[in-house]
């Protein structure tokens, strides 16, 4: 497959992060990375989440349970390229490992402990080897999360319409974004409503999530176009006159089935109507933010 690298695009790394589990981080990271690979040159997906969902969902359980390659690369300076596996023609994976808690502990006593991912993976590989690097992060604070934010300096936050989504974004902002910004520039690229399925003309969790992020000035500019709703759109929804696409990444059986098939969505169901959302996420990473 020919690489579709655009020399005008700036290589960029991005972390997919929210301080709450079960909010679609792995699904978002996998399909964002796959769309970046489809649109550009080579892309690296790094799984730093100790639960290993990204690694499992792409079929690399053996690497998760083998020698601790994450320890070897981040702390012992092993060659990261010797520990990546190929997912598709242009997409590689640096898998997670079952002993990431040990890596977390050892990082606490290491020199430059928050710079290891940047120094050993992102900085040497971004640009020359990979056009983009996507990092799936843990759902809790710690050195691995610090490494992901410091190395990428760009953040995408997925949100599911479940109880606790608001505390998830509040804690992510307070305990990750604002704290990190005391030490380095960290850009929030997008807030991504995902796995939506309910009606919007009734008092549902989907509606509450979409209304909150679209109506708050401090959040609205980070909402992708596929989830953006104007005041006029809400009036049309309540009047039963809305004719636009349903906003957000919608729940689709093929997304879940792709995980069970150990494939990104594009490689499992190239006709899925939600691929356009992941493609826009890729454009947001390419552009460095949402463009209305």
Describe the residue ranges of each PLM region.
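P-loop NTP-binding core
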Residues: 1-292
